């Protein structure tokens, strides 16, 4: 027989009655001196933190990553040096635009983030299922998200808003061809691919730098829903993707993804009709071959969703030695924004939470702030200092010097915008069924959208491929010919 556990306050004091408040007699008011009541209500009032401004709706799981092929010729990152190296990971999948309890059937990119707890500290992979993004410069990030979020006056998402933005942002066209395919409504988190979206730099022991993009390929295959299938699921279930992931892991059907790397030598950066460091551009596999890196297996569900899935924080700038960010303009903005939002949302010491803490020692002079529950104790909280017992900088970890491309500063327009070339490639690579789904999904989404906005988008589609625009126009009853005379 086990000892009976006492219900207690947060001060550890046993509670004798958790059913009735203290009152002044049977019919009198509740007493302010009822510490149990006040503590319980006050804590309940503060149970939630601000939800993520994007990627609020998510599901996570623990697992492992096993390196299957040494990457030492590209990077000196320790966890990628030897075949068979195992690294603990936590992965979080998410929808992007809508709130924490929104349906998982909605058309939306899916976030695909993985925290690697490596022997050199944490490494964050922060990507999406779709390989490109809407914009090429972080200065437009608040605007694209505002356009996709609900109207601040009605609190209802309005196609007039985001299609207006898309029509005036031709660089978004490639993302549209992915998002409005059936890949914009995945069947489950277990059956989505993942992409770094941005290029990064890998540096090996000799100091040689290459640009890379990373891709996750699900062993279960990529499975999507049609708009009609998504609607049928949504009528019955808001949580189908979270439920599927949780139940698969509980039943021992552990989802797996293979990680691949694509490599670009910096000397070849200018050999294309687009900028490979532009987040609106894909690196197609037949041009940039995939090389297998390793396999991720998710094998344990969180014990506490709030403490783990909700409190985990990612930043694409959290890199280990042998990795650096590229000059991608969207990535450069994310390097600041992602940790900044976690400090606002969770608190300045969010990295001390177990889900965010590295497995390696943390030894520095960053102290105090709200809730510093892993406070360092040395009286020497400055550097440099003359004490041999204190942590010292290690020149072996100085980032290697990198060539800077450019000799002037200013608000310069990106080179080689090529806004429609990659969308054309995507259209060409789609099957007849995929093209039909893309057209149908756009036509359906345009219900209630102003005609002038539709026409501007059709002009963009026409510059991708006339057939693309013609089929969308036919579905909406617009006479395309009179609106594209100047484009012929």
UniProtKB/Swiss-Prot annotation:
Organism: Listeria seeligeri
Cofactor(s) required for function per UniProt: heme
One biological process term in Gene Ontology: hydrogen peroxide catabolic process
Domain of life of the organism encoding this protein: Bacteria
Enzyme Commission code(s) on record: 1.11.1.6
Region (Disordered), start-end ranges: 1-24
Protein family membership: Belongs to the catalase family.
Polar residues compositional bias, start-end: 7-23
Encoding gene (name): kat
PROSITE patterns per UniProt: CATALASE_1 (PS00437), CATALASE_2 (PS00438), CATALASE_3 (PS51402)
Protein name as annotated: Catalase
GO cellular component: cytoplasm
Localization per record: Cytoplasm
Enzyme active site: 55, 128
Binding site for heme: 338
Listed InterPro entries: Catalase, Catalase_AS, Catalase_clade1/3, Catalase_core, Catalase_haem_BS, Catalase_immune_responsive, Catalase_sf
